[in-house]
Amino acid sequence: MKRLAELMIVVMGILLGAPTMAAQEWSQEWARERIEKSPRHSEWVTVEHDGRKVETLVVYPESKDKRPVVLVIHEIFGLSDWAQELADELAAAGYLAVAPDLLSGMGPNGGRTNTFPAGGVMEAVSKLNPDQVTADLNAAADYALKLPAANGKLYVTGFCWGGGQSFRFATSRGDLSAAFVFYGPPPPQDMMPRIKAPVYGFYAGNDARIDATIPATISGMKAAGKTYDPVTYDGAGHGFMRAGEAPEAIDANKKARDDAWNRWKTLLAS
């Protein structure tokens, strides 16, 4: 009986803890704390297009001059606390960061990422219509470029699922200055000739699924006469930009994040 009681306690603990563990797909307390301490102005705006309302985070740099726009595409975990903190970090570096929640209107009662039940975000993101995603991104970019603080220059970046979307976005957006793809898959090779902007890749050494796509991407982009510059960070795992700044980050992810961030800032400033 005692053993049965102990087992029941363990089972109940797992069941009660499951929502908390699953909720971490979009919730990072350490990232939220950093956002709350940020001195930069941020605001939520509703970007409307084609009957859709896309809730979008805009974070402004502390600058007297007009600055480039960086369109941020979130991971498969939705517009998480970390994605919002990353937008703030871009603003700290001097860029007008715009991060649309691509799950806007898709959650319970028409909510966005933070309204989904535990474990529901990844499935919802994976089912998003690619054309809807592109339309949402175009609308957010168009909105941002019209802001008085914008200087007309547009970059796009994405992570994980969003990395793939940033690469895909480059096939349809002709006014991009550059696309920054963090550990995301490439678009089909027959779409690569449409790309006009240089594409810079950031990949993890311990990410066989995505790394396996790099050789064909190199050859496909070369055949299309496009600029593609991938860098792989040894020892890092998929998602190192987020994992590398978490309190429990391993050294390889920390180093990869630092090196990638320095490279990224250099490219943005070039």
Where are the regions that the model predicts?
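Acidic catalytic loop of the alpha/beta-hydrolase fold
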Residues: 206-211, 238
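C-terminal catalytic histidine-bearing segment of alpha/beta-hydrolase fold enzymes
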Residues: 222, 227-270
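Short beta-strand/loop motif that positions the catalytic acidic residue
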Residues: 195, 201-203
